[in-house]
Swiss-Prot record:
This is F-actin-capping protein subunit alpha-2. The modification Phosphoserine is found at residue 9. The modification N-acetylalanine is found at residue 2. Belongs to the F-actin-capping protein alpha subunit family. The lineage of its organism: Eukaryota, Metazoa, Chordata, Craniata, Vertebrata. The keyword Phosphoprotein applies. Keywords: Acetylation, Actin capping, Actin-binding, Phosphoprotein. InterPro entries: CapZ_alpha, CapZ_alpha/beta, CapZ_alpha/beta_2, CapZ_alpha_1, F-actin_cap_asu_CS. GO terms for biological process: actin cytoskeleton organization; barbed-end actin filament capping. It comes from Loxodonta africana. F-actin-capping proteins bind in a Ca(2+)-independent manner to the fast growing ends of actin filaments (barbed end) thereby blocking the exchange of subunits at these ends. Unlike other capping proteins (such as gelsolin and severin), these proteins do not sever actin filaments. Component of the F-actin capping complex, composed of a heterodimer of an alpha and a beta subunit. Component of the WASH complex, composed of F-actin-capping protein subunit alpha (CAPZA1, CAPZA2 or CAPZA3), F-actin-capping protein subunit beta (CAPZB), WASHC1, WASHC2, WASHC3, WASHC4 and WASHC5. Interacts with RCSD1/CAPZIP. Directly interacts with CRACD; this interaction decreases binding to actin. The keyword Cytoplasm does not apply. The gene is CAPZA2. One of its GO terms (molecular function) is actin filament binding. It comes from the Eukaryota.
Length: 286
């Protein structure tokens, strides 16, 4: 082990550490970071070399953050990344600095985004917030309006998580939706992601995603937003139902085919008793 450690350069150590961090399960960033910190045993190297991994993790996970002085949380995403550690809160029309390691927002300042698409963005945001409030107990959403390749584009991001460390599981839902504002009809593109980690009696992760495409009728801002939400709701309901049914089927068939729930004797083994019997027998023979 010592020989292997001597063979690894600082660059290779940082690369491995960064990979661990970017693959940390939802809600377990701090635990993974602390473990990596112990393994690397060089705080300066970790902070400087793996800073990009901290940022990438928050961008990928749609990390929600509360800005002091503002009621609603905002998501950290690539769509709100203004560079130099600054991010956009389109609802409150501010930008702020974000510490990717501490996950803290500071220095909020006024920021004017794309005015041409703002009325569309606001309408979609209003409709999406109502939808998220109804379907996600801990949901947060952020809606962006920007020009991409000369086209006015709406990007809607949703994040909802449950971190239950005391019960040995954590999970996160993310979805991202995009459409351009074009006359008559447009294409809606979405991606839905679920990641759950269960680690009480083992170590099991569910990582799933689904790509969505649908057509959206474009009329006025309010009506278009309503039609957009119908597409989002139908797709996300279908995805959630499919995931639930699929894993129920796996539990009833695949998992049972792989392993018996009870041994051949049809009796569960009390390993604690067996261990105590063995220890007692050894003590008697001593």
């Amino acid at each position: 082990m010592a020989d292997l450690e001597e063979q690894l350069s600082d660059e290779e150590k940082v690369r491995i550490a960064a990979k661990f961090i970017t693959h940390a399960p939802p809600g377990e960033f701090n635990e993974v970071f602390n473990d990596v910190r112990l393994l690397l045993n060089n705080d300066n190297l970790l902070r400087e070399g793996a800073a990009h991994a901290f940022a990438q993790y928050n961008l990928d996970q749609f990390t929600p953050v509360k800005i002091e002085g503002y009621e609603d949380q905002v998501l950290i995403t690539e769509h709100g990344d203004l560079g130099n550690g600054k991010f956009l809160d389109p609802k409150n029309r501010i930008c702020f600095k974000f510490d990717h390691l501490r996950k803290e927002a500071t220095d909020p300042r006024p920021y004017e985004a794309e005015n041409a698409v703002e009325s569309w963005r606001t309408s979609v945001e209003t409709a999406l917030r109502a939808y998220v409030k109804e379907h996600y107990p801990n949901g947060v959403c952020t809606v962006y309006g920007k020009k991409i390749d000369g086209q006015q584009t709406i990007i809607a991001c949703i994040e909802s998580h449950q971190f239950q460390a005391k019960n040995f599981w954590n999970g996160r839902w993310r979805s991202e939706w995009k459409f351009t504002i074009t006359p008559s009809t447009t294409q809606v593109v979405g991606i839905l992601k679920i990641q759950v980690h269960y680690y009480e009696d083992g170590n099991v992760q569910l990582v799933s995603h689904k790509d969505i495409q649908d057509s959206l009728t474009v009329s006025n801002e309010v009506q278009t937003a309503k039609e957009f939400i119908k597409i989002v709701e139908a797709a996300e309901n279908e995805y959630q139902t499919a995931i639930s049914e699929n894993y129920q089927t796996m539990s009833d068939t695949t998992f049972k085919a792989l392993r018996r729930q009870l041994p051949v004797t049809r009796t569960k083994i009390d390993w604690n008793k067996i261990l105590s019997y063995k220890i007692g027998k050894e003590m008697q023979n001593a």
